[in-house]
A protein has these predicted regions:
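Active-site-flanking beta-strand signature of metal-NTP-handling nucleotidyl enzymes
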Residues: 49-54, 91
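A short pre-motif secondary-structure segment
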Residues: 90-93, 132
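Hydrophobic framework residues that shape the active-site pocket
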Residues: 58, 77, 99, 138
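Conserved nucleotide-binding and Mg2+-coordinating catalytic segments in signaling enzymes
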Residues: 17-37, 53-67, 75
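Signal-transducing coiled-coil linker helices
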Residues: 1-25, 32-43, 47
Length: 175
């Protein structure tokens, strides 16, 4: 009995440490470590779809309202992204205001529909009485063996697409 209890405790602790190593504490999303671990195990790139996201104006909210407000911005954005994308792939927080989703097979989802859902959720969030005007720049790329030598090339194309979207969204004026 005693030995079984010790084994159970060790197993629970190991699971907790694994979760702490893979999860972002603020958002509960998978973290950069998990992203690198998952992408290093990624054997089949053929139908891979990568979405990348960047939270616009986070620095403004941190500077004007404090880091608690910035943290709220990040957690609210993560909640929206999880709501839309979690059925399709893993959501990772890979930087302070950067997220991404890896989807194994782009044929299993409608990309334009997912982006439309993201914009609708942003609008619903922003229509409520909040101090934060949430704006999530979004880019994506589908693996193309003609142009992508590896996952890094796919990431670069997704980032370029996201930066184009970020420029389009920059017309936003602060409340």
């Amino acid at each position: 009995e005693y030995f079984a209890g010790i084994c159970c405790l060790v197993c629970r602790r190991a699971a907790l440490y694994r979760e702490l190593a893979e999860k972002d504490l603020l958002t509960g999303c998978y973290n950069r470590n998990a992203y690198h671990e998952d992408t290093s195990r990624c054997k089949k790139l053929t139908n891979l779809l990568l979405f990348v996201f960047d939270l616009n104006n986070l620095k403004y909210y941190n500077d004007k309202f404090g880091h608690d407000c910035g943290d709220q911005y990040i957690t609210d954005a993560a909640h929206i992204l999880r709501k839309i994308f979690s059925r399709h792939g893993k959501l990772y927080r890979i930087g302070g205001d950067e997220f991404c989703v890896l989807i194994d097979d782009h044929n299993t989802c409608d990309i334009s529909h997912l982006i439309c859902c993201l914009r609708k959720e942003e609008a619903v969030y922003n229509a409520s009485s909040r101090n934060i005007h949430l704006q999530i720049a979004c880019g994506y790329a589908v693996f193309d063996s003609r142009t992508d030598a590896d996952l890094d090339a796919l990431q670069k194309r997704a980032d370029q697409d996201m930066y184009e979207n970020k420029k389009q969204l920059k017309t936003f004026s602060y409340r």
